[in-house]
Amino acid sequence: MRILGIDPGLRTTGFGVIEKHGNKLAYVASGTIKSDGNSTLPERLKTLYDGISEVSRTYAPDCAAIEKVFVNVNPQSTLLLGQARGAAICGLVGYGLPVFEYTALQLKVAVVGYGRANKAQVQEMVTRLLMLPGQPGSDAADALGVAICHANGSDTLGTLSGLAPDLVRKGMRVRRGRLVG
């Protein structure tokens, strides 16, 4: 399975492509899509949309994973990030890809094993997990991390969805991301 990970941003959007074969992950490509800060917002969003579309055509992924927006201290920044994320999702869906969403916390737990990991720790673990010769930039590393998060979680999600009816009958439910009974 080939997975395209996206770390959305209005100035710089990171992308990372990995392949999953059984339990093994293999690096395919990564990079960034940059928009001109002097352009209008609609032009910047189109640059992002076109870039995501081109990456999708070039690497032909089976699915995409994108980081969810977090609410920032500055509401204007959150709104702009949400618009950039929307443009990225439109580019992915326009290519016909199923899109999966993950929080920064899920990404950090999947890659580093610790939800409060910093960017340097994510970069280091992405480099190790994919056996890269050098560290990718922080945006590309986050995108690769989202792809790794999906690769690691897709088997678990499939298994859990098959078990869901049995667990419900036994009185089990998910609370705060944990299975409780």
Curated annotation (Swiss-Prot):
Its EC number is 3.1.21.10. InterPro entries: RNaseH-like_sf, RNaseH_sf, X-over_junc_endoDNase_Mg_BS, X-over_junc_endoDNase_RuvC. Mg(2+) 1 binds at residues 7, 139. PROSITE patterns: RUVC. Transmembrane segments: none annotated. Mg(2+) 2 binds at residue 67. One of its GO terms (cellular component) is cytoplasm. Keywords: Cytoplasm, DNA damage, DNA recombination, DNA repair, DNA-binding, Endonuclease, Hydrolase, Magnesium, Metal-binding, Nuclease. The keyword Cytoplasm applies. GO terms for biological process: DNA recombination; DNA repair. Binds 2 Mg(2+) ion per subunit. Belongs to the RuvC family. This is Crossover junction endodeoxyribonuclease RuvC. It comes from Cupriavidus necator (strain ATCC 17699 / DSM 428 / KCTC 22496 / NCIMB 10442 / H16 / Stanier 337) (Ralstonia eutropha). The gene is ruvC.
